[in-house]
């Protein structure tokens, strides 16, 4: 297993392009997560792709031959498909929407609500979805119980500029164009497609894996169903990694995956909690990464400090 210093990790993170800020993105943790992956494998499958931070990081290092991106949130997949396959189209259409806010009567905030209304009325183009994501608070996608995008705009900024977007998506396209499939299916359908030689990376939405509805998505994910799907991967000999629960200070959030799955749990240092800093406490957030059987055996022995809990800084 390759290891990196904290300074190297920061440098790697800065050099990996991203499309737009996205709450829950594993971009900052990608260098740590990739340390537990094989140097080469056939296909990377992301059933909960979001903005595909792990796929982008893996493709930059040319570790996989093919990539499969899936997310139940179809408009997000529309962004990824255009960014990778037709970046010229995405940049041109996004530029139109983004520049319109600068001259819109009533200002950029009013413009945001106009685009949001159009999106909810059916114009779920990649450019509209990307603009809403770039402008909304914390880059946090939120839907109502009826599937309406209901996040508010961040009034302090205009969102990712077309120039910055172009620089990043052309890089991303150069890594992934012609090597990637896109879908918006139930994650279990995607897992059925995995074969030995593939690596599945799963980052289920928040604690939607804990029987609760996650309002980034149109449906929640049942814990027992998820555990059953993971067990099925085990029985088929598929390599996989899961970003799942974690802790901040003394507080643990999320439910541990069952021990009978035979997974190794690693705690990755995600840095100081911004919320705790605001409250005058300096508490470190750790995010859990679960490794399947063969990935555990590939890990360098010096890193096997504990079977269930291991801090990686």
Model feature map: region roles:
Residues 213-221:
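Short, surface-exposed loop/helix-turn segments at secondary-structure junctions
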Residues 2-32, 87-201, 205-213:
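SAM-dependent nucleic-acid methyltransferase catalytic core
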Residues 220-313:
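Long, positively charged, glycine-interspersed low-complexity recognition regions
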Residues 56-58, 79-81, 193-194, 210-214, ...:
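A short acidic (Asp/Glu
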Residues 51-54, 73-75, 135-138, 187-190, ...:
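Short, solvent-exposed loop/turn segments at secondary-structure junctions
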Residues 35, 40-117:
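SAM cofactor-binding core of SAM-dependent methyltransferases
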Residues 47-48, 70, 183-185, 202-204, ...:
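Short His-Asn-centered micro-motif
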């Amino acid at each position: 297993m390759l290891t990196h210093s904290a300074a190297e990790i920061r440098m790697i993170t800065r050099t990996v392009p991203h499309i737009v800020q996205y709450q829950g993105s594993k971009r900052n943790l990608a260098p740590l997560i990739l340390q537990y992956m094989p140097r080469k494998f056939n296909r990377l499958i992301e059933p909960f792709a979001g903005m595909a931070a792990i796929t982008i990081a893996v493709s930059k290092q040319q570790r996989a031959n093919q990539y499969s991106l899936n997310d139940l949130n179809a408009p997000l997949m529309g962004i990824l498909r255009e960014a990778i396959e037709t970046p010229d189209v995405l940049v041109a259409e996004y530029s139109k929407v983004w520049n319109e806010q600068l001259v819109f009567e009533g200002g950029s905030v009013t413009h945001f609500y106009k685009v949001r209304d159009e999106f909810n009325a059916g114009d779920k183009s990649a450019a509209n979805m990307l603009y809403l994501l770039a402008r909304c608070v914390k880059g946090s996608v939120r839907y109502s119980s009826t599937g309406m995008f209901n996040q508010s705009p961040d009034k302090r900024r205009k969102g990712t500029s077309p120039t910055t977007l172009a620089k990043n998506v052309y890089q991303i396209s150069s890594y992934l164009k012609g090597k990637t499939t896109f879908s918006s299916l139930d994650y279990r359908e995607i897992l059925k497609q995995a074969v030995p030689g593939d690596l599945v990376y799963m980052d289920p939405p928040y604690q939607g894996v804990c029987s609760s509805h996650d309002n980034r998505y149109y449906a929640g994910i049942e814990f027992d169903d998820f555990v059953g799907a993971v067990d099925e991967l085990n029985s088929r000999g598929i390599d996989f990694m899961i970003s799942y629960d974690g802790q901040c200070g003394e507080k643990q959030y999320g439910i541990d995956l069952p021990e009978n799955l035979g997974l190794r749990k690693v705690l990755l240092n995600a840095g100081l909690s911004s919320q705790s800093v605001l409250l005058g406490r300096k508490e470190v957030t750790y995010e859990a990464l679960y490794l399947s059987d063969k990935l555990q055996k590939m890990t360098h022995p010096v890193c096997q400090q504990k079977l269930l809990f291991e801090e990686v800084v």
